Structures are given as structure tokens and as C-alpha cells.
A protein has these predicted regions:
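Acidic-basic catalytic patches of nuclease active cores, encompassing PD-(D/E)XK
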Residues: 3-68, 180-226
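Short N-terminal signal/transit or membrane-insertion segments
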Residues: 2-15, 70-75, 163-174
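Conserved catalytic cores of phosphodiester-cleaving nucleases, focusing on short active-site segments
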Residues: 48-110, 208, 227-228
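A generic secondary-structure micro-motif detector
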Residues: 120-122, 194
């Protein structure tokens, strides 16, 4: 159980951080007119009909785009939009081994005869030089949270991942850390409401800590009957 818990916390932290990042990215591509507003889909869509998919390949984020370099025209003269597509993986420096599946996916789409033109992007904290250069050669944007959204947002995402990834609340001044995270991410549409729920257990834990020094979060508790 302890082994599963140790594996679960970093995964939960990464998925939560990437969820906030997807909201920020969605807001950014909409506000900058890169995509057709209502066509955006993310991997968090519960409706299977709205899965982010292009040419039968799944991505974390997709949206139709009417940017001129991405447009195509049918024989009848009808406009065929291109697509903005993005995958992301936070939490470590990515090597070419990590990114090769994404590169292959993008090249496969480009090789298909009737596939739409795409603007490909990958977001990670850091890339190896080999991975960065190979992404550029493949026509993919190797982005980072800091380059896209600035240092404050990138720092807040790191703080969030660090906080949620801790099995025990060993960090000092967690309430201040949570407040700092919320302040830095306040301008991302939907992020504040999401974090109020996701960080609720941490806020409660800090309150309980007043009377009890030994506090753990994220543990699955069971009754004597084995019920969770």
C-alpha cells in the first residue's frame, strides 16, 4: 500500500498541474485567435464524441484553425481548416526517447494524403539538446510553460506539483504556499475553481494540524469492515 501511495502522489500531482496548464493553453490560443473558439477539445472531455483527435491520432489538446498557412481548399472551393494540436508532459527533462512517439505521430499525419495541415506543439519543463533539435527538424514547436506564460505561472505550476506530490505535509508555511499559487494562477479561466476543490484537503489538513502535529493527506482510509 505504501508503494502504491508513493507512486500515486507524483502522478496525481502531474495530472493536476497539466490540467491547469491545459486551461492556460486553451485560454491563450483562444485569446490570440490561433483557433476557432468553440472547436477546442482537451483530453479531459468526458464525452467520447469530443475526444481531441486528428487523423485518428489522439492528442492532449486539439482545435480547428483558420490561420492562412493551415488552410486548404476542396475542388469545389470549400475551405478546409487546419488544426492546432498539442501534447504535454511535465515533471522531468525530456530526451529524444520520450518525444519520439510524438514526433512519429506528427510525421505520420503529415504523410497522409488528405490529412489537414497542422500546427504541432509539445510542452515540457525542459528538453535535452538532441530532443530540442529533432523537434525543430520535424516542424514541431518545443514549448515550455515559462516561454509561453512567463516565470510566475511556471513557478506556480512547479509549486503546485511539489505540494500535491508530497505524501506528507512536510513543507513549512503551506497556507502561504497555497495562497501564492492561487494568486499567480488567478488569471487562468477556471483554474481557481478547480484548485479550490483539489487543494481543499490540504487546507483542511493545515487546520487540523493546529491540534495534531501528525497529519497526512491523500491516504485512502478504510473502516474495520474494509470499506473505504
Amino acid at each position: 500500500d505504501n508503494g502504491s501511495l508513493r507512486a500515486l502522489h507524483p502522478l496525481k500531482a502531474r495530472l493536476l498541474t497539466e490540467s491547469v496548464l491545459m486551461k492556460s493553453l486553451s485560454q491563450w490560443v483562444r485569446n490570440n485567435g490561433i483557433i476557432s473558439y468553440d472547436t477546442l477539445r482537451t483530453r479531459e472531455e468526458l464525452n467520447s464524441d469530443q475526444t481531441p483527435c486528428v487523423a485518428n491520432f489522439d492528442f492532449d489538446v486539439t482545435a480547428a484553425s483558420y490561420l492562412n498557412p493551415l488552410l486548404r481548399f476542396s475542388r469545389a472551393g470549400e475551405i478546409r481548416p487546419g488544426f492546432f494540436v498539442c501534447d504535454m508532459l511535465l515533471g522531468c527533462k525530456l530526451s529524444l526517447v520520450h518525444l519520439q512517439p510524438f514526433i512519429t505521430k506528427c510525421r505520420s499525419i503529415n504523410s497522409l494524403r488528405n490529412s489537414p495541415r497542422c500546427l504541432f506543439m509539445f510542452i515540457a519543463d525542459e528538453y535535452s539538446e538532441e530532443a530540442f533539435l529533432e523537434m525543430k527538424r520535424a516542424g514541431i514547436i518545443p514549448a515550455t510553460p515559462e516561454k509561453l506564460f512567463g516565470k510566475d505561472v511556471a513557478d506556480a505550476l512547479f509549486q503546485l506539483r511539489d505540494l500535491v506530490g508530497s505524501i506528507t505535509l512536510s513543507l513549512k508555511d503551506n497556507i502561504a504556499a497555497i495562497d501564492d499559487i492561487m494568486s499567480k494562477l488567478a488569471n487562468i479561466a477556471g483554474a481557481t475553481n478547480q484548485l479550490q476543490g483539489d487543494l481543499f484537503e490540504y487546507i483542511v489538513a493545515e487546520t487540523v494540524r493546529i491540534d495534531s502535529k501528525d497529519v497526512e493527506v491523500g491516504k485512502i482510509c478504510k473502516s474495520l469492515k474494509g470499506e473505504t
